[in-house]
């Protein structure tokens, strides 16, 4: 995939939004580790965080390769992501895992929408980006399942993140839009 043969607006938006999402996920896991890092679930969170670090590294590389600017909301993602991770971890392992399940489910759904969009445009032209998104989507779904295996359903909080934009909480809809 080269700069010359792609829909720049679509690729810019995908890379910018995914970079912001992976940055936010990294901050969530950082917050969870600050609270639960020395507990029995610490290694589980660390393993998921390590994968998120790889995702962020790849999107950093894609931003440079395709000359995409980051979202203006990076400082916001920094603070809010950490606060969300630490705040849910303060509710215990189950609260942190409930957050993980909700966030990873939402991200996987978002990646699925991007895959559909790129497949409709030209799957051969976007094969490199499609491979990255598919791989990361699959890893996000693994994190979702790990959260369920570690008692997310027993959490003291109930995260509902809708899959359809009209069902998605207004604040989250605005954040996805602003990240682009």
Task: Report the location of each language-model feature.
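Non-heme di-metal
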Residues: 1-180
């Amino acid at each position: 995939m080269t700069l010359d043969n792609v829909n720049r607006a679509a690729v810019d938006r995908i890379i910018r939004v995914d970079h912001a999402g992976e940055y936010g996920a990294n901050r969530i896991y950082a917050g969870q580790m600050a609270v639960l890092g020395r507990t029995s679930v610490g290694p589980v969170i660390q393993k998921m965080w390590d994968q998120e670090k790889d995702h962020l590294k790849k999107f950093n590389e894609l931003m440079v390769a395709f000359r995409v600017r980051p979202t203006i909301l990076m400082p916001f993602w920094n603070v809010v992501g950490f606060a969300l991770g630490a705040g849910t971890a303060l509710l215990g392992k189950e609260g942190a895992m409930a957050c993980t399940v909700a966030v990873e489910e939402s991200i996987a759904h978002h990646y699925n929408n991007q895959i559909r969009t790129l497949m409709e445009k030209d799957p051969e032209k976007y094969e490199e980006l499609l491979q990255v998104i598919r791989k990361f989507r699959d890893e996000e779904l693994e994190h979702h399942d790990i959260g369920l295996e570690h008692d997310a359903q027993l959490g003291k909080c109930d995260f509902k993140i809708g899959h359809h934009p009209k069902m998605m909480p207004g604040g989250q809809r605005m954040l996805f839009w602003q990240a682009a």
